[in-house]
Swiss-Prot record:
<keyword id="KW-0717">Septation</keyword>
<protein>
    <recommendedName>
        <fullName>Cell division protein SepF</fullName>
    </recommendedName>
</protein>
<comment type="subunit">
    <text>Homodimer. Interacts with FtsZ.</text>
</comment>
<comment type="function">
    <text>Cell division protein that is part of the divisome complex and is recruited early to the Z-ring. Probably stimulates Z-ring formation, perhaps through the cross-linking of FtsZ protofilaments. Its function overlaps with FtsA.</text>
</comment>
<dbReference type="GO" id="GO:0000917">
    <property type="term" value="P:division septum assembly"/>
</dbReference>
<dbReference type="Pfam" id="PF04472">
    <property type="entry name" value="SepF"/>
</dbReference>
<feature type="region of interest" description="Disordered">
    <location>
        <begin position="21"/>
        <end position="41"/>
    </location>
</feature>
<keyword id="KW-0131">Cell cycle</keyword>
<dbReference type="InterPro" id="IPR023052">
    <property type="entry name" value="Cell_div_SepF"/>
</dbReference>
<dbReference type="InterPro" id="IPR038594">
    <property type="entry name" value="SepF-like_sf"/>
</dbReference>
<keyword id="KW-0132">Cell division</keyword>
<keyword id="KW-0963">Cytoplasm</keyword>
<dbReference type="GO" id="GO:0043093">
    <property type="term" value="P:FtsZ-dependent cytokinesis"/>
</dbReference>
<comment type="similarity">
    <text>Belongs to the SepF family.</text>
</comment>
<dbReference type="InterPro" id="IPR007561">
    <property type="entry name" value="Cell_div_SepF/SepF-rel"/>
</dbReference>
<dbReference type="GO" id="GO:0005737">
    <property type="term" value="C:cytoplasm"/>
</dbReference>
<feature type="compositionally biased region" description="Basic and acidic residues">
    <location>
        <begin position="23"/>
        <end position="41"/>
    </location>
</feature>
Length: 145
């Protein structure tokens, strides 16, 4: 009959009101019928697991090196072939990719004389120790020492 504010006011001035015993079925029934509009899922997916993409590029011009770096930035494994690139551009391409590798904390590995693999930091790539030592001594990746 009285709402909460009126009841507090009457109690303040010293008048007490006794409540009538009413069945409280209606409030319980209302509570049971209330359903959340949208149930939240208990499991949240963070990302796609184990879906690593490998991209292969056969570069011909220096301007195409941007594709390699963009794919690396998208966390893709990149294999690129420099066999059709002019000799004076090969070192420029390797320098450009090496800069991207450094900035993105990735790794670069030489597969053959003009084929390279670049992997993002979230992926481990095993390289044979003998092959690794050969690359270090030849000076292609002297900064790996």
């Amino acid at each position: 009959m009285f709402d909460n504010l009126q009841r507090k006011f009457l109690n303040l001035i010293g008048i007490e009101i006794e409540e009538e015993d009413k069945p409280q079925e209606s409030t319980k029934a209302k509570e049971e019928n209330v359903k959340p509009k949208h149930e939240t899922p208990k499991v949240v997916t963070i990302g796609k697991a184990n879906q690593t993409e490998v991209t292969v590029y056969n570069l011909k011009l220096f301007d195409e090196v941007v594709k390699v770096c963009d794919a690396l930035r998208e966390n893709k494994i990149v294999v690129f072939n420099l066999e059709q690139v002019a000799e004076d551009h090969i070192q420029r391409i390797i320098d450009f990719v090496s800069g991207a590798v450094y900035v993105l904390d990735a790794k670069i590995h030489k597969v053959s004389k003009k084929i390279f693999v670049v992997v993002p930091r979230s992926i481990d790539l095993e390289v044979d120790e003998q092959l690794k030592e050969e690359f270090r001594t030849k000076g292609v990746f002297a900064w790996l020492k």
